C-alpha cells in the first residue's frame, strides 16, 4: 500500500440511512451512487476496504416492542442484505470488483461469510461488503462491524455518521453539543457517547481497535481519515 496511508486495511461501517438519501425509508439510487463514489476514492488509494452495512433505512429491530426481539433483529439483518446488494451494484457499475458475504446463508445472491475467503478478496483488491449483521439477534450492526474489524485484522474501525465526529450529545438535537477529538473507550462508555453501542465499544477496547468517526457526506472525508490528515 502507498506510504502516505495511515491505515492499510480498514473496516468501514455504513448506517442504513446513508442509503435512503432525502427519504426516510428505502433505497435512493442517487444516495447509493454518492456512497459508492466516496468508497471508490478510498479504494483508489490502495487501501484494503471491507464494509459492514446497517439496515436502519428499512427496519430497526430494537424499536419494535410488539415483536419478539430475535424475529425483529432477523428482519433487520435481511434489510442489510438489500443495502449490500445495492452498493455492490453501484460499485461494480463503476468497475470496482466487489463481493458480498452474508452472515445468514443466501447462496443464490451472495457468498456465505468465510473469514479466509474475505481476506483473500481484500488482498486481491476487491471490496468486501459484509451483510446480515453478525447473523445473531441482540447484536447491532455496529457490533458486527467491530467483530468483522477484529476478524479481518483491520487497522481501524471507521464509523460513517451524519455528523463529523463524536459529540457529548446528539448535535442534531442539541446544537451546543461539544465535539470530542480524542476519548478513551471507557470514558466513551461511561459518558454514554452514543456513537457506538457499549458492546461494540468494549469489543474494540479489548482488542485495541482504533475507532474513527467521520461524516461521509463531507467530500474527501474518508480519504482524509485514511491519509491521517483529518483531525
Which residues does each predicted region cover?
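C-terminal catalytic "cap/lid" subdomain
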Residues: 1-231
Amino acid at each position: 500500500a502507498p506510504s502516505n496511508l495511515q491505515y492499510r486495511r480498514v473496516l468501514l461501517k455504513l448506517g442504513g440511512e446513508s442509503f435512503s438519501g432525502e427519504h426516510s425509508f428505502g433505497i435512493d439510487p442517487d444516495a447509493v451512487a454518492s456512497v459508492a463514489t466516496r468508497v471508490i476514492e478510498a479504494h483508489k488509494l490502495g487501501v484494503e476496504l471491507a464494509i459492514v452495512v446497517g439496515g436502519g433505512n428499512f427496519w430497526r429491530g430494537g424499536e419494535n416492542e410488539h415483536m419478539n426481539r430475535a424475529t425483529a433483529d432477523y428482519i433487520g439483518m435481511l434489510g442489510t442484505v438489500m443495502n449490500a446488494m445495492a452498493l455492490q451494484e453501484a460499485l461494480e457499475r463503476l468497475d470496482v470488483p466487489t463481493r458480498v458475504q452474508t452472515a445468514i446463508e443466501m447462496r443464490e445472491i451472495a457468498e456465505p461469510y468465510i473469514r479466509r475467503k474475505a481476506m483473500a478478496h481484500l488482498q486481491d483488491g476487491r471490496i468486501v461488503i459484509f451483510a446480515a449483521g453478525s447473523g445473531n439477534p441482540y447484536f447491532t450492526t455496529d457490533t458486527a462491524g467491530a467483530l468483522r474489524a477484529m476478524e479481518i485484522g483491520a487497522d481501524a474501525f471507521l464509523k460513517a455518521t451524519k455528523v463529523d465526529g463524536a459529540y457529548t450529545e446528539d448535535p442534531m438535537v442539541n446544537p451546543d453539543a461539544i465535539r470530542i477529538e480524542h476519548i478513551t473507550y471507557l470514558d466513551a462508555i461511561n459518558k454514554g457517547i452514543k456513537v457506538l453501542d457499549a458492546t461494540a465499544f468494549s469489543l474494540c477496547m479489548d482488542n485495541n481497535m482504533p475507532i474513527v468517526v467521520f461524516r461521509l457526506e463531507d467530500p474527501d472525508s474518508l480519504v482524509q481519515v485514511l491519509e491521517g490528515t483529518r483531525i
